[in-house]
Amino acid sequence: RFTSQMAAALETGSLISDIKLGDFLRRRGVTVIPCVNPDGVEISLHGSAAAGEYRELVHNVSCGDTSRWQANARGVDLNHNFNAGWEALHTLEREQGIYHPAPTRYGGEYPESEPETRLLCDFCRSQYFRHALAFHSQGEEIYWDFGERTPEKSRLMAQVLAASSGYEMSEPEAIATG
């Protein structure tokens, strides 16, 4: 939806949150990666059969209900697989009895253990990004606070996004901060 709004604003010259996008993009760029976890989306929509070689694992881990599946086909929640607070999340997972692949919140054996996470991190390390935003349509919430690692303008950016998207600014529970 965000990229559609951007394209429409570019075509018509309209504003997004009081910003003329064409002028903005002449000075800056925007990189959009539409979906980091396509197999997870397919599993959530179409069940364990969409997991290919991992269908048995997905079926067993989900007990046949994949409607709330958030992990990749290997049962790793990619939001928990980045090397940003991974050790703390791993500890919280253990405290909640999460030791192995699961529909959500299992961060993998080590940070960037999953090809999706590793490729995204490699791409980001190869670029100079001043800001990074991650959109999650589930819940229609904007998480902007990351403790001591929260960038300076995060709150302001979240306020602009909330005003333009209708999503609520929110703080996730501790185990969901990945």
Model-found features: residue ranges?
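Active-site/substrate-binding loop(s) of hydrolase catalytic cores
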Residues: 1-146, 151
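Catalytic cores of processing enzymes, dominated by hydrolases/peptidases
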Residues: 109-110, 139-178
